[in-house]
Amino acid sequence: FETLASYGEVQQEKVDDMREQNKSVHSQQKIALVVDSTCDLPVDILEKHHIHVVPVRLNFGKEQYIDRVTISNEEFYSKLANSAHHPQTSQPPPADFRRMYQFLSSHYESVISLHLPKVLSGTYQNASAALEKVTFKEHQVILDSLSVSAGTGVIALELAEAIDQNMSFAELTQLADETVEKTEIFI
């Protein structure tokens, strides 16, 4: 998008991960797990467990990026060290969540969507508003992680491993509640 911006003004950015979509089509899992990109898990773990990520927006002054899509972690830390602007984030728009849920609803029976605490960000609310407009065959739930970064990552990994073990949706939501309750992170 940076290259295109030099030729004019980018009005809107839309990015789809075709590799991830292909994996979803061929997945044997019945329950999808969705997180936002503040969930601090390495890409190899996200891919291994088919964890679907809706990216947050990052702003350095007037420059806007889509986390992990139009800016890598390395580029982010380089900008952090060299930019005169302190980065700011904004939650993914409801349309990003809706697009993700619509795609997943055609390949999975249920979805668990785990996000930043609703008291810290509008991410949870945007995910919830989007999910109200999409129907899965079985179940759908939005979970407040009550945590950030690595804390959300721990919860997501616990759920992903349980999904891999074919736990039922009811067992997964109970596990989520227990894991959220016992997960603490110090900043």
Kindly label every feature range from the protein language model.
Residues 151-165:
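Short, small-residue alpha-helix embedded
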Residues 32-91, 96:
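N-terminal glycine-rich anion-binding loop in soluble enzyme alpha/beta folds
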Residues 27, 98-109:
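Glycine-rich phosphate/diphosphate-binding loops that line cofactor/substrate pockets in enzymes
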Residues 94-103, 127-130:
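Short, charged beta->alpha transition segments
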Residues 2-25, 161-187:
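Internal, active-site/partner-interface "lid" segment
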Residues 115-135, 154-157:
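Short Gly/Thr/Asp-enriched flexible loops that form oxyanion-binding sites at enzyme active sites
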